[in-house]
Amino acid sequence: EHNLGLAVDFNDVDYAFENEKAFTWLMENAEKYGFILRYPADKEKKTKIKYEPWHWRYVGPEYAKEMNDLGFCLEEYIEYLKNN
């Protein structure tokens, strides 16, 4: 994802980032700019990747909003699109 230019790490690999104001802002506003939290804590079984609060992925504002509204990670959203 980083090599494709679709992902950004907003902090060093540091779990304390989730306690910072920047993380709170991202959680509240990232979808407006088309970003999703790529590896949420409650989706580790689906993503097969440990929670990474610093790692965000660009999917576009429309898709980011829909994914957040549905409560889906990227893997779940792709599966949803394939079946609907």
Language-model regions, residue ranges each:
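Catalytic cores and adjacent binding grooves of peptidoglycan-active enzymes
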Residues: 1-84
